[in-house]
């Protein structure tokens, strides 16, 4: 294993340990000592939970069986609970300080019970909300759009993260949605797979039923590249999804381009790739680029519309706020960068906690006007 993944794991594990310590410390201050045996059990549980997600993720990267899947799902749910327990602990201390400054009596157990209960409610809501895929309908106008495409619809499906949490049943749900929406073309702009060790063939097999008249197209995201991207590509090709790797196809006059996530991150490489494709500036073009980045280069290349995912809209609070600090207005939705239009989808699936709070899972139906 290279040094940087190890350092990343150590960094994340350190953050998780500190978060668990903070929650434990808050529990002690606000509820007090519960006795020798209960406290020993609490410490042991906190210690094991602190390592659960990293351990489950590592197991999930190398092994695929029902026990690993169960461990990963439980650890992922706990990671979401941890997030909201951490927020609850912060609110406990903030409320205690506020009451003290106002000279009011502080009821620590009541404060703790109130905020930690809200954390559980938020987590339960997030679990349910993450399974309710919305259909977002977006009309769009592109300069140079061939007349034959006017009135047609394209389905954009990003960030499924198929693996230990979202299995083949999730794939079937997407196929059923597509059948109901009846798009003429389907785009998968990355992170179709989670990158974990899994049966890619079984996960992708439901997509064989997709039958848009002008085909389905995919370009890799960062999680696809964490796993066996070549294997994923073979599997998708077999079920009828065209994998675009630094290439352009012309579909009934519309230029469709796909760039792998690993290449789009390098400005010089991306610029050279787009130049080599010899795009026709007078005809509409759509780029599948997983991350909503390198927009000056992409606009300069003459791309009409970029389809992205990656951000999940932040997925759960407070990461919704942090993601917007990182990507600005391109965190979500249809935005403009000069002559370039960018649609960033919040995605249909989840990564890590199978929860969504402050965002909604979606597929996007673009209607060309």
Please give the residue ranges for each predicted region:
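Non-catalytic terminal accessory segments
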Residues: 1-131
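Canonical alpha-helical transmembrane segment with a positive-inside/aromatic-interface signature
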Residues: 105-150, 154-156, 162-167
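Soluble catalytic domains of enzymes that build or remodel membrane lipids, polysaccharides, and related
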Residues: 141-369
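Short, mixed-charge, low-aromatic patches
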Residues: 31-34, 47-53, 109, 128-135, ...
């Amino acid at each position: 294993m290279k040094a940087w993944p190890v350092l990343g794991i150590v960094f994340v594990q350190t953050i998780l340990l500190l978060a668990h310590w903070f929650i434990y410390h808050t529990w002690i201050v606000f509820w007090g000592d519960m006795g020798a045996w209960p406290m020993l059990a609490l410490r042991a549980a906190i210690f094991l939970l602190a390592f659960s997600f990293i351990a489950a993720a590592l197991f999930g990267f190398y092994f695929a069986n029902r026990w690993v899947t169960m461990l990963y799902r439980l650890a992922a749910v706990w990671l979401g609970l941890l997030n909201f327990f951490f927020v609850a602990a912060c609110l406990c201390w903030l409320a205690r300080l506020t009451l003290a400054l106002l000279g009011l009596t502080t009821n620590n157990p009541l404060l703790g019970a109130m905020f930690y209960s809200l954390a559980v409610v938020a987590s339960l809501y997030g679990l349910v909300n993450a399974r309710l895929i919305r259909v977002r309908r977006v009309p769009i106008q592109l300069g140079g759009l061939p007349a034959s495409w006017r009135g047609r619809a394209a389905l954009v499906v990003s960030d499924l993260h198929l693996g230990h949490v979202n299995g083949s049943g999730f794939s079937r749900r997407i196929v059923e949605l597509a059948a109901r929406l009846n798009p003429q073309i389907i785009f998968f702009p990355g992170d179709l797979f989670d990158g974990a060790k899994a049966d890619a063939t079984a996960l992708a097999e439901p997509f064989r039923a997709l039958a848009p008249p002008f085909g389905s197209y995919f370009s890799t995201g960062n999680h696809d590249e964490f796993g066996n991207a070549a294997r994923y590509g073979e599997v998708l090709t077999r079920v009828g999804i065209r994998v675009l790797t630094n290439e352009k196809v012309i579909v009934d006059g519309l230029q469709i381009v796909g760039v792998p996530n690993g290449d789009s991150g390098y400005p010089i490489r991306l610029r050279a790739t787009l130049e080599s494709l010899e795009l026709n500036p007078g005809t509409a073009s759509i780029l599948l680029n997983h991350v909503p980045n390198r927009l000056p280069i992409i606009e300069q290349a003459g791309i009409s519309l970029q389809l992205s995912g990656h951000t999940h809209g932040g997925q759960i609070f407070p990461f919704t706020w942090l993601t917007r600090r990182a990507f600005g207005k391109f965190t979500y939705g249809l935005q403009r960068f000069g002559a370039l239009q960018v649609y960033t989808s919040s995605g249909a699936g989840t990564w890590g906690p199978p929860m969504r709070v402050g965002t909604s899972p979606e597929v996007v139906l673009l209607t060309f006007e």
